[in-house]
Swiss-Prot record:
Compartments, record wording: Peroxisome membrane
Source organism: Danio rerio (Zebrafish)
Disrupted-gene phenotype: Mutant fishes show a loss of peroxisomal structure, associated with high-mortality. Defects are similar to human Zellweger syndrome (ZS), characterized by developmental abnormalities in many organs, organ-specific accumulation and reduction of distinct fatty acid species, such as an accumulation of ultra-very-long-chain polyunsaturated fatty acids (ultra-VLC-PUFAs).
Protein name listed in UniProt: Peroxisome biogenesis factor 2
Residue spans, topological domain Cytoplasmic: 50-55, 133-141, 220-312
This enzyme's EC code(s): 2.3.2.27, 2.3.2.36
Gene name per UniProt: pex2
InterPro entries recorded: PEX2/10, Pex_N, RING-HC_PEX2, Znf_C3HC4_RING-type, Znf_RING, Znf_RING/FYVE/PHD, Znf_RING_CS
Amino acid sequence: MAGAGGDKPFAKAGPSPLSRVLRISQLDAFELDGALEQLVWSQFTQCFQHFKPGILTPVEPELKALLQLLLWRFTIYSNSATVGQSLLNIRYKNALIPGQKYRPMSRPQKFWFALLTVGEKWFRERSHSLFLNHPAESNARKARKVLSILLGLTKAASLVNFLLFLQRGTFPTLTERLLGVQPVFSRPQGPRDINFQYLNRELLWHGFAEFLIFLLPLINVWKLKAGVSALFSPLSDLTGTQSSEETHLTECAICGEWPTMPHSIGCKHVFCYYCVKSNVIADIYFTCPKCGAETGQIEPVRLQVGTELLQS
């Protein structure tokens, strides 16, 4: 009997579920919780986007507190963990009860947690308007001064608590330290498998992007486009019918549209001034993509209608 309950080796490897949570994991949980609150508030305000502007402004602190209480009800009150902590396999432990066994947060701790988080945020946002309508000589002025001193002391205490958290790795907020709740792992953590596949892929794509940034300016796009056009133009001439002279004069040999400020390079084809000028600037050996004629003097197209000579 004694041997059955004697010293027995641990069956599971890895740290205990009550082992210390990394500082970065605790801070990441706070970031996720803050992002969730902003997302819920933005979705809530979108429901009133077609109402009168500013309709939620008078009761905005109360509405935010109500939404935060709903989140508290289905996270801390139900599971002793926020949404961010649940995503990171973390939950709160009642550190006031000694021992290695996990103890969830007690009901008073949960209610005090809501009061010190949701209630503190609401009071900080609403405190300015609470004393705004009171005259300067009333007792509200003294109360506001005392309140500002208390808020300053609270911020100083939070700063000291955060410095202690950076040193010891426990109780990242003043509320957790006052209530005696500590983040622990929900399940035992196995050995961390480090995989550099994502990092290697990112480095590969960054290197490929830098290579393209260096290579693309060296490629003459205009010359490449003209070469492709000249490559396929003989095929179209063989399969199609012979183009008339009117077609040459009403269609740019480069873009295929109606010529804008028609110019020629010495052959029978007509070009837009921008098309031919940009190609000649990009490639001094530019040739006509239709007939392969070398570029001569770029001149406006001269048309003879009847007995009159018209210059485009």
